[in-house]
Amino acid sequence: AWWDRLSPLAQPWQPAPLVIPASDFLPPAERRRAGQAIRLALGCGYQAVADSGLEAGGIASVFASTDVDAENTHRICLALNEAEPTLSPTRFHNSVQNAVSGYWTIVTGSHAPTTMVMGGDDIFAIGLLEAMAQAAQAAGPVLLVVFDVVMPEPLFSVHPIEGGGAVAWTGSRGAPEDHGRPEGVGAGVDGCEHRDAAARD
């Protein structure tokens, strides 16, 4: 049953070093420019799509995060505090909220809709609601990726995220006989674990 595949989520949380998924699928230029948070989100999303057997370039996507790339935000703040502020173009283009969506469309060649949402401590629920709303209206599947990394100080004091991680899910509206129950398959990155978090019968 699908709920048996969610059993790892019921285990007590254990801190572990965050392992970023391999980013071989990224073109060299994007691999150099993408920060840790973006590589984490893309890697987890790419794993979920590969596990689902879907074509990454043909599905809508929703990315959800508390702060997207906190390290990049921190570096920009430090640069702006200098006597003569200088800001690299890479830092600037990675600072926009939907940077990860942009990287995703570059990597996959997707012309499908892509959305980036932010929502503080409620981000998982907000991302899931957005993905389910899109799945209910769309003719095809939707990818949801929820991700966060640990913020550096002083941002950590404002919003302490104890550990980074990501979870991704692909799903679509169920058939009428399933009463609209969503079907999906997913992948999680929590420390050095990769686990299947599918919600399928």
What role is predicted for each listed range?
Residues 41-46, 51-53, 116-142:
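Active-site-proximal alpha-helical scaffold in enzymes
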Residues 1-116, 146-201:
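Conserved "HGTGT" condensation-loop signature of ketosynthase/thiolase-family condensing enzymes
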